[in-house]
């Protein structure tokens, strides 16, 4: 039996069951394959961008994370939190956050490719990332999040941070 009072919403799970029944195994497999293909494309393109390093070399699920190259991060006047804010101005929800305990010094960004996310949308996201980087690189002064990081002060993300508040590197 399913309870509607569980801690996590079940609507997404029910939606997946519905899709699986409606599409069948092969149809659902194709949906997941398409999401994975788009995720690999975005992963590869982000890996080509000068400021970034992908956390892993391959994508096995339709999600991945990346971070600023350490040498780039030391000289940059901005952080991934600033990139998150720029992308949110264009309607993208690409969170920047610290990793969980014992890795909380690392700030990463995450992309999750959901069903229906097309190659055209991926190209729009990549274009918005490139435009945001161009804007951020033109800054004359460090952003408040960059200054806070330099002083080892708490930097709170607006989206998600595993309960960690600081970034020390």
Region spans (language model):
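Generic non-transmembrane alpha-helical segments
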Residues: 41, 45-49, 82-92, 128-139
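Catalytic cores of large soluble enzymes that bind and process phosphate-bearing ligands
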Residues: 27-34, 38, 75, 114-117, ...
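Flexible glycine/proline-rich, aromatic-decorated loop/lid segments
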Residues: 4-9, 84-101
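Composition- and surface-driven signal marking solvent-exposed, interaction-prone regions
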Residues: 30-34, 47, 58, 79-83, ...
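Conserved PLP-binding catalytic core of the aspartate aminotransferase-like
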Residues: 52-93, 113, 119, 156-168
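Active-site C-terminal subdomain of aminotransferase-like
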Residues: 4-61, 67-72
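PLP-dependent enzyme catalytic core of the Aspartate aminotransferase-like
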Residues: 103-169
């Amino acid at each position: 039996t399913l309870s509607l009072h569980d801690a996590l919403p079940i609507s997404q799970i029910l939606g997946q069951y519905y899709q699986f029944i409606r599409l069948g195994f092969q149809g659902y497999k194709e949906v997941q394959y398409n999401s994975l293909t788009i995720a690999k494309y975005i992963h590869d393109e982000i890996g080509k961008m000068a400021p970034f390093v992908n956390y892993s070399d391959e994508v096995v699920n339709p999600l991945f994370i990346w971070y600023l190259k350490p040498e780039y991060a030391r000289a940059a006047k901005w952080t991934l939190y600033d990139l998150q804010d720029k992308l949110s101005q264009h309607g993208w929800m690409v969170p920047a956050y610290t990793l969980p305990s014992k890795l909380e010094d690392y700030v990463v960004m995450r992309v999750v490719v959901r069903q229906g996310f097309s190659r055209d949308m991926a190209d729009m996201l990549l274009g918005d990332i490139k435009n945001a980087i161009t804007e951020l690189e033109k800054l004359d002064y460090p952003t408040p999040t960059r200054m806070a990081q330099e002083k080892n002060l708490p930097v709170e993300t607006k989206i998600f941070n595993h309960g960690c508040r600081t970034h020390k590197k």
